[in-house]
Amino acid sequence: AEKIKICLQKQVNSSFSLHNGFGGNLYATEEKRMFELVKPKAGASVLNQSTWIGFGDSRTDKSNPNFPRSADVSVKTANKFRSLTGGSLMLSMFGPPGKVDYLYQGCGKHKVFYEGVNWSPHAAIDCYRKNWTDIKLNFQKNIYELASQSHCMSLVNALDKTIPLQATAGVAGNCNNSFLKNPALYTQEVTPPEKCGKENLAFFTLPTQFGTYECKLHLVASCYFIYDSKEVYNKRGCDNYFQVIYDSSGKVVGGLDNRVSPYTGNTGDTPTMQCDMLQLKPGRYSVRSSPRFLLMPERSYCFDMKEKGLVTAVQSIWGKDRKSDYAVDQACLSTPGCMLIQKQKPYTGEADDHHGDQEMRELLSGLDYEARCISQSGWVNETSPFTEEYLLPPKFGRCPLAAKEESIPKIPDGLLIPTSGTDTTVTKPKSRIFGIDDLIIGLLFVAIVEAGIGGYLLGSRKESGGGVTKESAEKGFEKIGNDIQILRSSTNIAIEKLNDRITHDEQAIRDLTLEIENARSEALLGELGIIRALLVGNISIGLQESLWELASEITNRAGDLAVEISPGCWIIDNNICDQSCQNFIFKFNETAPVPTIPPLDTKIDLQSDPFYWGSSLGLAITTPISLAALVISGIAICRTK
């Protein structure tokens, strides 16, 4: 009789690298970084498609006859905007004659503003002020600030008011022989005309609600005339100019009083109108002005102030041959938490010179999607926690941290072989091992608990000579995940507080934030090293367990035909058990040799591999099996006589 020894043989050669883990080691033909570095995409995006709203003009207006060629956004995104061709928030606030007057209102946790160009130097609006840019800057800044603290906002286009009987609506030749809707100009008709008339006393009320919109705070334009000297105003002997707003307690909240404040001292015969932006609570207010003229607030924007939210402002400029201003840009840059989207090239439209710019379409294409992170540097929707460069604030969501590629730990991949147990098998994963993305995508401080690494390793596996059990390793992963969740919450709260404080001239806070993020990145990289070691050990143990199951199945199939002389080795009488018999024992004839273990079902190919040492005779088994987060893909047999 000829007896042969058949063993499951270690099949590692120089193409394999060794990976050490907690509780077990692995040989692998390949390795990969746990995460790749991601690069943010330039432009705007949102964290949640259901909780954002946009405010725009013709470039986001679906009702424009040239849509979609006239638009800088997709049809999907246009549906999210409150827009009208020719409109702007400021035009609706002041209502200059001959301009579009649109009722802007809506609700959203994230507000995207792409408007403003329709009130720019090209519009040539006068009405006692040839250059409105500084007022526009102040207006936009207040809009962004209040919008970031509110869920809903609405134009209030008709305030309740009481006007003195002696005042009647006035007009101005430099305002298309009309005047703004807000403020309204009232004048006194005095007989004889050389007399001054009486002081004006008027009242207006800011409501607590406008339609369905709650109003906790109003943005009001407090407008008044600026005279260069008393003589310019006092041609009729009417003393000093004043226009002052008082709250219900008699406190001054806005306006100008040349009875106590000096005139400009410039030379000129025509006054200029100035409008300051006031944030006022609902209530009744009074306006007192010197004889002859009264500028009366008639409109406001109301905000519910119910929750902090996100604000994105998009640069709004004309194409060639039209003069633009950059008030939107400056307003956003000076408002904490405002994200600004800017073009790098001149505006070049498709429908005409001013509508349908390709660069702007690309910058706004991200509004069609949900991002994991939005920032001044761009948006990210990949799951990696690392990026090559520091993302500039403000930033919101689960934002990646800056890291060097070589600092990211590597995990084994390709064909995997444990270094102990019943010796060997190999696996070729068809999907990502474990849910690492879900486990550590928080991008925050992580730390080792007082118990150290041992706090995660709760058990041992006696039959494999030590190490951790699969169950204890899973508990370890759960503990790491819980620790990370806790740290994620506390750290993100701290970062949000810093976001609230950051403005573009607060370099010290920027530096502090950068230091904190660097510390977060280093801590996360350290924790990933721990997870990598646990992962290697867990896979190694799982592979060893699968080998025990495989060896047990072979022994059971062999019955009395083969004698197991050591784990993974059998003696067979070649005269009693010929080749077909051996094929039955070791090749399984396409049947499943290992019980399935949920949850991962993977189609695998178990076969010999030219990388391996040992006999050229190999087992070929093709069967669907499931082994937690791993799959077997090859073993070989060593024959000895």
Swiss-Prot record:
Subcellular location, principal: virion
Glycan-modified residues: 13, 48, 131, 381
One annotated GO biological process: fusion of virus membrane with host plasma membrane
Region of interest (Esterase domain-1), residue spans: 28-138
Coiled-coil intervals: none
Stretches the record annotates as Esterase domain-2: 297-351
Cellular localization per UniProt: Virion membrane; Host cell membrane
Enzyme Commission code(s) on record: 3.1.1.53
Keyword check for rRNA-binding: no
PTM comment, free text: In natural infection, inactive HEF is matured into HEF1 and HEF2 outside the cell by one or more trypsin-like, arginine-specific endoprotease.
Region (N-acetyl-9-O-acetylneuraminic acid binding): 138-296
InterPro entries: Capsid_hemagglutn (IPR008980), Hemagglutn-estrase_core (IPR007142), Hemagglutn-estrase_hemagglutn (IPR003860), Hemagglutn_stalk_influenz-C (IPR014831)
Signal peptide (UniProt feature, chain positions): 1
Catalysed transformations (reactions): N-acetyl-9-O-acetylneuraminate + H2O = N-acetylneuraminate + acetate + H(+); N-acetyl-4-O-acetylneuraminate + H2O = N-acetylneuraminate + acetate + H(+)
Ranges that cross the membrane: 617-637
Residue intervals on the Cytoplasmic side: 638-641
Record topological domains on the Extracellular side: 2-616
Record note on quaternary structure: Homotrimer of disulfide-linked HEF1-HEF2.
Name of the protein described by the UniProt record: Hemagglutinin-esterase-fusion glycoprotein
Organism: Influenza C virus (strain C/Mississippi/1980)
Name of the gene encoding the protein in the UniProt record: HE
